[in-house]
From Swiss-Prot:
Function: NDH shuttles electrons from NAD(P)H:plastoquinone, via FMN and iron-sulfur (Fe-S) centers, to quinones in the photosynthetic chain and possibly in a chloroplast respiratory chain. The immediate electron acceptor for the enzyme in this species is believed to be plastoquinone. Couples the redox reaction to proton translocation, and thus conserves the redox energy in a proton gradient.
Annotated GO CC locations: chloroplast thylakoid membrane
Matches recorded under Pfam families: Ndh2_N (PF19530), Proton_antipo_M (PF00361)
The keyword Cell inner membrane belongs to this UniProt entry's keyword annotation: no
Family that this chain belongs to: Belongs to the complex I subunit 2 family.
Stated name of the protein: NAD(P)H-quinone oxidoreductase subunit 2, chloroplastic
Transmembrane segments: 15-35, 39-59, 84-104, 113-133, 137-157, 172-192, 217-237, 249-269, 283-303, 339-359, 382-402, 418-438, 471-491
UniProt-annotated location(s): Plastid, Chloroplast thylakoid membrane
GO terms, molecular function: NADH dehydrogenase (ubiquinone) activity; quinone binding
Length: 506
């Protein structure tokens, strides 16, 4: 076989988007080395351009795959570029683009070098994209650790901030423990399967195991679920979430809440549908428990929080439980609803964090009571934050309502009645704490303004001067509205996409 034939057999073109992200990382490092401080103003735009190009190419690959099915296995089966992976890789890349846009003003205000932040967040995005397509145990673990290590460094980006250092240490310790358990689980699967690395090969090898080895496989499933639960911030593996969310730089928290969560969910889907299809009952039971626990713990504890970042942290735990409902339906409709809700969540959650960043830059606080009377000082910020929070709560006619509706309908059709009822009840609880923040912001009485808002610079409705952060807020709010309006069409499109994903087997 000639070299050209060998290279063609790798189907390396499927990894061009990841190659572009890697080249973008190297370009940012090179520009910072050559031009130093003179390039700081436009380094972020270079990084966003590279990640945006990767997103566009992923969209093009998805379109080609839908119209003309091609080989999706890359590098000897270690990477699978099927329709499922293409969608999740695009979501992770888009979340990174938006997080960089939201971070420009924040990083500038700290006086730190933007190149470090950009390289780390792009590396985390690259790791997440590789997780989305990983099809063997080695690729899965290395990609997951690429995402994890970059995330640990991002949480400690503010080196002189004690809270940031504390958050980074907690995240590192809990992450290392969960990674160790995950690695222990995949090592068991490697041994039991007779030395296979590819997920499909392992799945075929464990179908006809004796009772002892079947029990070992079930234990491996539990161990690997711990690693997944950590990534998606699901209860009871959520203990790191509130402290890391409160102590880390807010743009980093925004990425962890969407990009890392998306990578965790595609990992869970790959693990359950490709690696453990013969343990369908077991993984359904495990993730049903995680879903119910996450929705109850996340939403009820969020009610008691006084910090908006901590509240959003516990909210993300509850949202993880809601997203698991889509996975537990084990149908194209359910997976499609999960993807559409994740896309809606991307915009509304990043929009909420963008508003927190902007308010924090102008006041230096993230306490909920300090938002009191914000409408009188900054109507744009108050309105945008209100829309994002109400959408997260699932208030109609906002996008979050339609996202949850599609998930609950798919679950109801699949017979998951208990999950739907728990989801509905905890959604009502979430509406309470989201509305409490909105009420605080919209009180008209001047005497009820917090000290932070009284000293807040009055902002008029104008386009000049407009900051990148304000552009990001507008994009997130607009994105959540548009996805909500086109929700039914997107669910239908994603249902067709998921039905063509061979790894799902649905």
């Amino acid at each position: 076989m000639e070299l050209s034939d060998i290279l063609a057999s790798f189907h390396a073109s499927n990894l061009i988007p990841e190659g572009i992200v890697a080249c973008t990382i190297l370009l940012v490092l090179l520009l910072d080395l050559v031009y130093s401080r003179t390039c700081h103003a436009w380094l972020a735009w270079v990084a966003m351009a590279g990640l945006s190009l990767a997103s566009v190419l992923l969209g093009q690959q998805w379109y080609q795959l839908m119209n003309l099915p091609t080989a999706t296995m890359t590098f000897g089966g270690s990477f699978q570029a099927d329709s499922l992976s293409l969608v999740f890789r695009a979501i992770i890349a888009m979340s990174c683009v938006l997080c960089i846009l939201l971070s420009i003003d924040y990083v500038e205000s700290t006086g730190t070098a933007p190149s470090e932040f950009l390289v780390l967040i792009a590396t985390a995005s690259l790791g997440g994209m590789l997780v989305a397509g990983s099809n063997d145990l080695l690729m899965m673990f290395v990609s997951l650790e690429t995402l994890g290590l970059a995330s640990y460094l991002l949480t400690g980006y503010m080196k002189r901030d004690v809270r940031s250092n504390e958050a980074s240490l907690k995240y590192l310790l809990v992450g290392a423990a969960s990674s160790g358990l995950f690695l222990y689980g995949i090592s068991w699967m490697y041994g039991i399967s007779g030395g296979h690395m590819e997920l499909n090969s392992i799945a075929h090898a464990i179908v006809s195991l004796d009772e002892t080895k079947t029990t070992t496989c079930a234990l491996a499933l539990v161990l690997m679920t711990v690693g997944v639960g950590f990534k998606v911030a699901a209860a009871p593996f959520h203990q790191w979430t509130p402290d890391v969310y409160q102590g880390s730089p807010t743009p980093v928290v925004a990425f962890l809440s969407v990009g890392s969560k998306a990578a965790g969910f595609i990992l869970a889907v790959r693990m359950c549908t490709t690696l453990f299809p013969s343990f369908n009952t077991e993984w359904h039971l495990i993730f049903t428990i995680l879903s119910i626990l996450s929705m109850i713990v996340g939403n009820f504890i969020a009610v008691t929080q006084t910090s908006l970042k901590r509240m959003l942290g516990y909210s993300s735990v509850g949202q993880a439980g809601v997203m698991m409902i889509g996975m537990l339906t084990d149908s194209p409709d359910g997976y499609a609803s999960l993807i559409v809700y994740l896309l809606i969540y991307l915009f509304m959650n990043l929009g909420a964090f963008a508003c927190v960043i902007l308010f924090g830059l102008r006041t230096g606080t993230d306490q909920i009571q300090d938002y009191s009377g914000l409408l009188a000082r900054d109507p744009f910020l108050a309105l945008c934050l209100s829309l994002c929070l109400l959408s997260l709560g699932g208030i109609p006619p906002l996008a979050g309502f339609f996202g949850k509706m599609y998930l609950f309908l798919a679950a109801w059709d699949a017979g998951q009645y208990s999950l739907v009822w728990v989801g509905l009840i905890t959604s009502v609880v979430s509406i309470y704490y989201y509305l409490s923040v909105v009420k605080i912001m919209l009180v008209p009485a001047t005497q009820e303004m917090s000290l932070a808002v009284r000293e807040y610079p009055r902002r008029a409705w104008s386009l000049e001067p407009i900051q990148p952060l304000e552009v990001g807020i507008f994009v997130c709010v607009l994105g959540s509205i548009l996805v909500g309006v086109a929700g039914n069409s997107m669910v239908n499109l994603m249902t067709i996409t998921m039905s063509q994903a061979p790894s799902l087997g649905v």
